[in-house]
């Protein structure tokens, strides 16, 4: 429904939480961005592709109020993803060592498409930028990064993770 779509992108510092069936909702990124475990356990597919819109690494210490707000936004939206990636890495390593039964625990291959360099230059306010040129820039950046992923990792799909979870998320 339109209300569900609004709720899925509701940033609480900008909008009131939409009410759906007596419950109030905010952007799901505050709890799971994206929630990975339902994707893993509700399919037979071993591969999960994560398209990251928030950078993981920001190399500058925030000094201004706006920069601190941007860092809080990045941390809050990445924290659940990082936690899940660490859990997946842990389970995968136990499966590979033979300490967990692969018939009971799923060996998952993680792939990521990201634009760290481009996204780390954007502030939290860019999430509200509806300028067509900006949206075209995001679209073209995504298309370019998806093409790079396919060129470099297509053969990994169904065989192995193309993302080094320890290097990227620890």
Model feature map: region roles:
Residues 2, 6-14, 28-35:
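Active-site glycine-rich loop that binds ribose-phosphate moieties when present
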Residues 14-20:
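Short acidic-hydrophobic surface loop/beta-edge motif
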Residues 23-25, 29-170:
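Non-catalytic peripheral regions of patatin-like phospholipases
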């Amino acid at each position: 429904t339109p209300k569900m779509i609004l709720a899925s992108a509701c940033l609480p510092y900008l909008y009131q939480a939409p009410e759906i069936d007596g419950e109030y909702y905010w952007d799901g990124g505050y709890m799971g961005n994206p929630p990975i475990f339902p994707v893993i356990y509700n399919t037979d597919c071993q591969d999960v592709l994560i398209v990251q819109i928030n950078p993981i690494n920001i190399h500058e210490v925030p000094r201004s109020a706006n920069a601190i707000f941007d860092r809080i936004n990045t941390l809050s939206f990445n924290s659940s993803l990082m936690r899940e990636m660490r859990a997946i890495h842990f389970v995968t390593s136990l499966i590979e060592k033979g300490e967990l039964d692969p018939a009971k625990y799923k060996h998952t291959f993680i792939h990521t498409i990201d634009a760290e360099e481009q996204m780390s230059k954007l502030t939290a306010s860019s999430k509200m930028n509806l300028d067509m040129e900006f949206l075209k820039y995001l679209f073209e950046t995504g298309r370019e990064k998806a093409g790079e992923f396919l060129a470099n990792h297509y053969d990994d799909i169904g065989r192995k993770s193309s993302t080094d979870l320890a290097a990227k998320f620890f």
